[in-house]
């Protein structure tokens, strides 16, 4: 059995792995604005960095929103497509060995997939908040989408200056909610908030939806 390459062409990143009889090999993430550029760049870098010959590859499987743009061979290799939600469900089942679970896939946005009995897989919903939200707000409010820079700024910020917390509206904890839990994201933000405080609020959005 040769290697099967799996590629998830997402909205902001492309993820790629190889699978052979020994298991999963060399996961890689490549970022690019254009999904086609990201796909071909990720695949070329993957096989080069890992010393993989095209002759070693039996199949290339594509998924993700960006894979819809691909309807031709990849470096001469035929490609097959699979549903992203099915891939998420099967992958989580394989990795966890659980028969019944809810899979939360946090990418550019966030989706929820239900797995029943290890084989019945269905998409049950999602929210339009994810990594793309963090990047977009950072571009608008901080004039950068460099996540490392945003995190450094957030470490110096004070979230209490940005988010309305339970303690701001109630003097006792609510069941399951500590006083420092966020009641309203950016609910206390003022026009003179520091950039560091704003960064803390943006990062908190991601944390609040984990």
Residue ranges, per PLM feature:
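Phosphate/pyrophosphate-binding loops at sites that engage ATP/ADP/AMP, CoA/4′-phosphopantetheine
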Residues: 43-58, 200, 209
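Flexible, glycine/proline-enriched loop segments at strand-loop-helix junctions
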Residues: 30, 78, 120-127, 135-140, ...
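A short acidic Gly-Thr/Ser loop motif
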Residues: 8-13, 65, 104-109, 128-131
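Active-site rim beta-loop-alpha module in soluble metabolic enzymes
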Residues: 139-207
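Conserved phosphate-binding catalytic cores of ATP/NTP-utilizing and phosphoryl-transfer enzymes
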Residues: 70-104, 109-119
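Short glycine-aspartate micro-motif
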Residues: 2-8, 59-61, 101-105, 126
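Short glycine-rich, Thr/Ser-proximal phosphate-binding strand/loop in the N-terminal lobe
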Residues: 3-41, 45, 121
